[in-house]
Amino acid sequence: MKKEKSCGAIVYREKDGVEILLIKHKNGGHWAFPKGHVEKKETESETALREIKEETGLKVELDTGFREMVTYSPKPNVMKDVIYFAAKAKKDSARPQPEEVLELRWEPPQEALALVTYTTDREVLQAFLRYLAQS
């Protein structure tokens, strides 16, 4: 069984309430969060920061106090762990990476929950919203 690992984050901003950044991936057309494979000697947080910058152009403040892991099998004989952190956007000027991202959207929490394609991502978003409410 081959193991893969990706890291990313739930990127948010506070603008008349909290808004969540969702990206529509070119590969599959699903709505999710910025993430990508860990490269060589990167830490989880370095990977998350790099992927957010690549996919959205945003500089963010990473909050590693929030850390959720999702495990799934993207194809036979492969198990993938995805680590998600929280990341507060420093600016609103997100721009999609044309090679990987079809569209970017800032959405209020309830709309984001409805738009996210996969149940596991919805569960991570719910955990993030609970975390944010306690912070």
Regions found by a protein language model. Give the residues of each.
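Unchanged
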Residues: 38-64, 68-127
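Conserved N-terminal beta-strand and adjoining loop/helix that marks the start
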Residues: 1-19
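A short gly/proline-enriched turn/hairpin at secondary-structure junctions
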Residues: 32-35
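Generic C-terminal helix-cap and adjacent flexible tail
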Residues: 130-135
